[in-house]
Design a protein with these regions (language model features):
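Alpha-helix-loop-beta-strand connector modules within alpha/beta enzyme cores
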Residues: 7-8, 53-69, 116
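Alpha/beta enzyme core
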Residues: 21-35, 53-63, 81-96
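Glycine-rich, proline-tolerant flexible connector loops at the mouths of alpha/beta enzymes
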Residues: 15-17, 37-52
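C-terminal alpha-helical cap/extension of soluble enzyme domains
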Residues: 136-140, 148-237
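Single conserved hydrophobic/aromatic residue that forms the stacking wall/gate
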Residues: 1-6, 11
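Catalytic cores of alpha/beta
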Residues: 17-26, 130-138
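Catalytic alpha/beta core domains of metabolic enzymes, predominantly
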Residues: 59, 73-185
Length: 237
């Protein structure tokens, strides 16, 4: 499996099966090595039953030749049980990767691996790595974290993969304050704020109408980051 960096992974989803398929086909044509897709949902209340979710992913799989990662995240408001996820992995050709971001992620990852067996090629952690160590202990083989400090996250994952759990835990404890700031305070603006501070980008503004980061949060974020000296703060200078 190619490394999933930058444009090699494409996030595609829509409430429309046809739109999701079209976007994913285009993503593959443009060089994506994988697509990550949530179950279909619209607004706060419109959801579909498991049968339609299954068909949604089955049709997508039939249209492309690259793996599908199902993102299991609370924002979709769609409960995805372990037996259902495992069944899709076992029966739908390209469904093989899972980004688990629900409460109790480690327990769900562990059970998904047990129930799904070899069909679960990529059980992944998410949510900015706030639960990375428990998720790795549960069997996660990868993580989709915030994009601002991969040098810090890599130290954790590399040490764990090398069988050096104590070293991985030490790195995790060191970087956890910054991970926490992103997950609980700065949110999706964290990477932009750090990149702006490091001279990588000119503006840290999110898409309107997303509110700007509060100055006090930004100050705390940068203070926390400077203690760790991530590459992002030096990259553009």
């Amino acid at each position: 499996m190619p490394s999933l960096v930058g444009s090699e992974m494409c996030i595609r989803d829509s409430f429309s099966t046809d739109v999701t398929v079209a976007r994913s086909v285009l993503a593959e044509q443009l060089g994506a090595a994988m697509v990550m897709v949530m179950p279909p949902y619209h607004g706060a209340t419109i959801r579909v039953p498991e049968a339609q979710i299954y068909e949604y992913f089955a049709r997508l799989s039939d249209a492309i030749n690259i793996p599908i990662m199902i993102q299991d995240a609370p924002v979709s408001g769609t409960p995805l049980s372990v037996p259902f996820l495992a069944r899709m992995a076992q029966e739908i050709k390209n469904v093989a990767y899972f980004k688990i971001e629900t409460a109790g992620a480690a327990s769900k990852l562990r059970e998904l691996i047990r129930v799904g067996g070899d069909a679960i090629e990529g059980p992944w952690d998410g949510e900015e790595a706030i639960t990375l160590m428990p998720d790795l202990d549960a069997g996660a083989t990868g993580a989709m974290t915030g994009g601002a400090y991969p040098d810090g996250i890599r130290k954790i994952v590399d040490a764990y993969a090398a069988g050096k759990r104590d070293e991985a835990a030490a790195h995790y404890e060191k970087w956890l304050p910054l991970i926490n700031y992103e997950n609980r305070q700065g949110g999706i603006l964290t990477a932009k704020a750090l990149m702006k501070a490091g001279g990588v980008i000119a503006s840290e503004a999110g898409r309107h109408p997303f509110p700007a980061m509060h100055p006090a949060v930004r100050e705390g974020l940068l203070d926390t980051a400077k203690r760790l000296d991530p590459m992002v703060l030096r990259w553009g200078k």
